[in-house]
Amino acid sequence: HKIFVLNKNFEEYFKEYNFHKLYKELVNFCSLELSAFYFDIRKDTLYCDEISSSKRQACINLLGLILDMLLKWFAPILSFTTEEIFQIIYKDKNSSIHLQDFPIIPSKWQNDKLAEKWEKFKNIRKVVNAAMEIKRANKEIGSSLEADIKVFLNDDYLQLVEDFDLSENFITSKAEATKMSNENNLFKLEEIENIKVLVTKATGEKCPRCWKIFAGP
């Protein structure tokens, strides 16, 4: 969906010669959506899953698609840089990034419902990250993998998280969701309602491969 939206905006900005907006949106996508979010939650899949893992292969395929899109979107702005990258990646093509067609993204990639779902989930992740930062500041945990997370949610959010692997998306050793509670020791952000978090230090043995901490048998 995000690729569909970016490409639609690219076409609009390009026709209007509005390269500043184009550049700003692409940079924000790289720094906020990719670096600060997608790369963060997918690095364990790339590093720790088996080479034959379907999830790992899907991630690699998506990264290849994103790279191809970014090269074509950035080509009118960063002509030499994109050409250099293209020649490194596609050195056997004997071609140029500037001879490639601009992307044509099928309309079925547009999925506003899915985008809204992820935006709501990012609210939960924001509260969880803020709660873990306090634990880090107090020297109670080091990395997020030293944390066990329990999120307290209203019914709408509880239904939302059924489709998410919470520990993977929070980058913690363990995570679970439960119904909202009025306990006083729970962390919350005033600007985000219906989400509370309890962070405890994970106990057990640290896996030497993924670095997650698992309780013994």
Which role does the model predict for each range below?
Residues 164-181:
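A glycine-rich helix N-cap at a beta->alpha junction
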Residues 30-31:
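Hydrophobic residues within the alpha-helices of tandem HEAT/HEAT-like
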Residues 14-21:
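Short helix-adjacent coil turns
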Residues 196-205:
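Immediate flanking context of iron-sulfur cluster ligation sites
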Residues 207-210:
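Short cysteine-rich clusters marking metal-coordination/redox-active sites
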Residues 1-8, 40-131, 138-158, 178-196:
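Acidic, turn-prone loop/beta-hairpin segments
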Residues 212-215:
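Short functional micro-motifs and their immediate structural scaffolds
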